[in-house]
Amino acid sequence: MKVQGRDCTLTLLKDNEYYPLPYSEETVRQASKGYALPGCIGRRNREKLVETGKSITGCVVTRLEYNNILALFLLLFYSDDKFDILVDRVCTKLIYKNVSVKEFELRGENNEPLYFRLDVKDNDDSYVTSWDITTPSLPWTECRTFYYDGHSVIADSKTLPLVYRFELTGKFTEKTKYQITLYFPLSTEHYPTQNKIEKLTITLDQRLGIWLDLYDLKPLDDMTDVNCADTVLCFQKFEICGCVVFNIRNQSQNTQVVL
């Protein structure tokens, strides 16, 4: 993304390692926190907010690439660990210190790039500071971008004819919760899936051997057959009661991250 003819940069810093990301979108900011005072009864006064401090909130959206995919999934694995976000918006250069993962979304549409959204939250020692002379400006280096193939989704050893979109979400609160939504053309031959899916496999990149395995998927809603001659597009949401496994397996790397 360019602002005033210059590229913005977005970099994650964790354990003294820098991970430049392709700048797609980010809303990381400081938000006011406090309490509200109600207006006086009988008068048309607006509710007033008494500010007691600032909190860091927002999200980062980036494309999935070979240079960042493992680092992003390791952030989910160590969801309680803290990291920094370095943002160069041309007019301002800020560092959001000691934030952690609040939730995430991985989404893909058929023949389109895979996108990863990371929502952040602040901690007791979180703060915002400006770049100093020692802060490195690391431009993103273009590499292989991963594209989603809607014909490569496997449910219980059976390849589904088409899942044209999916959304995998996770929330890290007192109890970690994962859900996935599958979008597909309605077909009595392959759908609806009323029973739970024991294992769902989503290929992220066939060439480099990168995929996701999701275990013990329980449908959260029922499907209804529609007597229609035309194609009917629908979706079904599942709760992931088992684990989410991220895999990289090729000649140079054999890595597995279990969430």
Where are these regions (language model features)?
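Signature of extracytoplasmic/envelope-associated structural regions
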Residues: 1-259
